[in-house]
């Protein structure tokens, strides 16, 4: 085996798996506290092609938990910062970025309750795997349903805010989740749409109540970059977060993607 930056990974996965990862295209929606760590792990595992979707710019308040957030990156688009990190890790990787929020508007279709205004920008059939790391229910539903319609594997992250125990994260089918308020909503929405199964990462920890109300100071003294979309001032609730919780969720997501794409689960008989 020739030594390269992925040699240690190859020792566990094998050359065949590394080739599969190098040829895979993973679309990650949401490059924040969860999605940023997912992309980081995928890049360090040898995934060769990325589609990154996020309209947000790095904010000072992201520094406590987001891998892309540093003093020098504040004000820059998250997808641009993430692309730079990927290419610094693996110059051979191909990275496509979309500086937009995968938003939705009402639609009369029987299959889709929501239709994104930018739907034509995304051809899900070209993706090897889809990662949903957004925090908006309508966008999550649309991402999942479009992946399902194209028979593309998809994994979705449930709530990671207002939690302190990273050991409570689990991988399960959406219908076997408990405790998570977001998962409860998604169970109902997936059942309504006839979705039989959906792999998710969720936490069994009961959501904690923030000790202080940040919304007041954030609404009057917003430190987001001028003109940034979806400022904190426009959010109804601002969840508390710590570095060691959303990061773990993101790494678990990446682990599932790697094991599914590489085929190592079957060869190693992993559960």
Label the model's feature ranges.
Residues 1-27:
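N-terminal charged helix/coil linker that caps or initiates catalytic domains
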Residues 2, 125-126, 139, 149, ...:
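Glycine-rich phosphate/adenylate-binding loop
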Residues 28-30, 53:
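Conserved N-terminal Rossmann-fold NAD(P)-binding element of oxidoreductases
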Residues 34-35:
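Hydrophobic/small residue at the entry helix of a nucleotide-binding pocket
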Residues 43-49, 149:
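Conserved S-adenosyl-L-methionine
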Residues 47-90:
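Glycine-rich phosphate-binding loop and adjoining beta1-alpha1-beta2 segment
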Residues 74-107, 114-122:
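Ligand-binding beta-strand-loop-alpha-helix segment within the catalytic cores
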